[in-house]
Amino acid sequence: SAGEKKNHNFRASFQTGFRNPTTQDQYIGLDLGPFALIGSAEANLDRYIEVMNVSAAGQALGFAATKELTGRDAYNTPVYSVPSVTRFAQTGNVADLEITSVNLVKPEQVKAFEVGYKTVLENGLSVDANVYYNIYNDFMSTSRVITPYYGTVGSDYTTDGSTDLIGLQAIANGDRRVFQVYTNTSETVSSMGLGLGLSKKVYKDFELGANYSHSQFEFDQSKDPSFIAGFNTPKHRLKASLGNTKLFKNFGFNVNVRWNSEYLWQASFADGMVPENTVLDAQINYSIPAIKSVLKVGAANLFGKDYIQVIGAGAIGQQLFASLTINP
């Protein structure tokens, strides 16, 4: 603390932590149609089995009508990254194909740094600010890869053998499986942000407040194209509030406005952009001293349109509520 009245408070912290893979990360085996979601536990790889139909073009090359795949076709074996196969489909250039091998997932580690400042100024303005920076090792999320039903995954297309070319033909025939797998990236991942909160009584018992947060995620996608980071956090959030617990006898109110910028949502179910949202919430309180109770009536997303916070989930609409709290 600093200042004559010790009202300037500074804080700083350094922490280390880790995040273990969840049960789903390790043991899920789910066919989602366009791709299969495979957990990374060693015991799970043989547990997941699916039989895929081979195209007529593939059968004409002499391959069976079906192909059995297991979780081992997704992990610890050469596979193609999904973005590179997409480019190959557009250009026909085999040099666009990128070969990778997915390792089993392991715990993620983080080093977290934070500094902050808090004060109440002589004019009654309360200030709370903080800045943070996180460094991740073995950042844990998912990756999407492709394996052909026949042929081999390889980069030497000039050999006398035809297995590599047959693998390319499998991709061209649509005889390939997309796997979404749980793994770690070896690339550097960091996140940083800041927060600022202000509050002040502006007139009699009216309380005005505002909060802003900035969140930023740094990951070079070009160095690990198939990795899906899934930060899923808006870069900017803003909240403003106005309230008075003593508007007049036994009555109070509070109004909040919340806004966030658009952000990318990435998950095993769906990916997409979540649009920016502005939400207005309001509440009035009425105290009933005779029965030691408080009646609250309010609305969330008042006058607003339905909005989403997660791709693939239902939209959030308006909510009206009322409650009576009794304090005997």
PLM features: residue spans?
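Transmembrane beta-barrel strand/turn architecture of Gram-negative outer membrane proteins
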Residues: 1-25, 29, 112-132, 211
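Conserved C-terminal beta-signal and adjacent last beta-strands/turns
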Residues: 8-11, 15, 51-57, 199-214, ...
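Membrane-embedded beta-barrel scaffold of Gram-negative outer-membrane proteins
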Residues: 11, 43-178
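Surface-exposed loop and edge beta-strand positions of immunoglobulin-like domains
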Residues: 15, 106-108, 118, 132, ...
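Short acidic-glycine motifs
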Residues: 19-20, 25-41, 137-147, 220, ...
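Short sequence motifs at beta-strands and strand-loop junctions characteristic
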Residues: 97, 104-109, 177, 186-190, ...
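Short, P/G- and charge-enriched loop/turn segments at secondary-structure junctions
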Residues: 101-103, 183, 270
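Gram-negative outer-membrane beta-barrel transporters
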Residues: 120, 126-267, 323-325
